[in-house]
Amino acid sequence: SESNTCG
C-alpha cells in the first residue's frame, strides 16, 4: 500500500 502526508 502507499501512504503519504502533506501539511
Curated annotation (Swiss-Prot):
Principal cellular location given in the protein's record: secreted
One GO process term, biological-process aspect: killing of cells of another organism
Source organism, top-level taxon: Eukaryota
Tissue: Expressed by the venom gland.
Keyword Secreted: yes
Keywords associated with the record: Cytolysis, Secreted
Compartments, as annotated in UniProt: Secreted
GO cellular component entries: extracellular region
Reported function: Presents moderate hemolytic activity at physiological concentrations (micromolar range). Does not induce mast cell degranulation, lactate dehydrogenase (LDH) release from mast cells and antimicrobial effects. In vivo, injection into mice induces increase in nociceptive sensibility, but causes very reduced or no edema formation. It also causes no alteration in rearing (standing on hind limbs), but does not impact locomotion.
Descriptive protein name: Cryptide Pep-10
The organism of origin for this protein: Tityus obscurus (Amazonian scorpion)
Taxonomic lineage: Eukaryota, Metazoa, Ecdysozoa, Arthropoda, Chelicerata
